[in-house]
Amino acid sequence: MRKMHFFCIFYLLLIKLGYNTIMLRMLKNPKTDNTKYFKECNTRSSTISSRWPEVTTQRWVSHYGFQATPLPPEIWGQEELLKAVNEEFKFDNVGVVKLPPYFNYGWHRDTDRGCSINMLLSHDESHTLFQTEVVRENMDFRFTELKYKPDTFYIFNSQESHCVLNFKEPRFLFTCEFGQDKNELSYETLKNWVSKYETRNQSKD
């Protein structure tokens, strides 16, 4: 009886605090359509994944909370996918960005960039998360994770809220910025173009 009495009081408190709805929603485990947030490319890296350490001795500059250094066209231009994307949409910046150990790059949407092409270069422990649902404003969120595969490019939706948690080693990521801002080049446009490009190339093989 005492246990039942305790749980009744506890449940009433949850109702009073408005947590009952939150708890029920958090118990659900809905399937998320991750292609709203990111899309894995079929084309694998042939050059950047092996040559990126060459640029780590360059000067690093602060860039939106990251440390960044450029990747020269002599390297990224050997990637057929990136060369084709650049011909269609034109890159403004192509480079490697670095996060320090034990660093949380908090929830945000990119200021100007609508989308990018990313590839994780170092595969120590880090997590890239996208918010899929706000359960309690500024407090509780559902999320999905982009689990980067080695040597793999991803179309990345910079206008969906995302964050990065990095642990004990520096984290290196290939990324790019386009000449077009978020109002001129959307994630959906880039994703669809890359999908068509890869389908055409696959049919030629």
Label the model's feature ranges.
Residues I15-F89, V96:
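Non-heme Fe(II)/2-oxoglutarate
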Residues E133-D205:
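Catalytic core of Fe(II)/2-oxoglutarate
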Residues I75, Y102, E125, H162, ...:
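Residues that cap or initiate secondary-structure elements
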Residues W76-Q78, E88, L129-T132, L185-T189:
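Short, charged, solvent-exposed linker or helix-capping segments at domain edges/interfaces
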Residues F89-N157:
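Catalytic core of non-heme Fe(II) oxygenases with the double-stranded beta-helix
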Residues M1-M4, I9:
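N-terminal amphipathic/hydrophobic targeting modules at extreme N-termini
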